[in-house]
């Protein structure tokens, strides 16, 4: 028996961003 259906794509890891990345050269 299958516990869960086969995943089409792997889960995308997105870290929670508090603020947008600041570009500082």
Swiss-Prot record:
Region (Disordered): 1-25
Residues covered by region (4 X 5 AA tandem repeats of P-P-V-[EY]-K): 5-24
Keywords, comma-separated and alphabetical: Cell wall, Hydroxylation, Repeat, Secreted
Pro residues composition-biased segments: 8-25
Compartments where found: Secreted, Cell wall
Domain of life: Eukaryota
Location, primary (coarse class): secreted
Coiled coil: none
Keyword Repeat: yes
Cysteine pairs bridged by disulfides in the record: none
Sequence repeat start-end pairs: 5-9, 10-14, 15-19, 20-24
GO cellular component assignments: extracellular region
4-hydroxyproline sites (modified residues): 6, 11, 16, 21
Entry's family note: Belongs to the plant proline-rich protein superfamily. ENOD12 family.
Protein name (record): Repetitive proline-rich cell wall protein
């Amino acid at each position: 028996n299958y516990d869960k259906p086969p995943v089409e794509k792997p889960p995308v890891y997105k870290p929670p961003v508090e603020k947008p990345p600041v570009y500082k050269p």
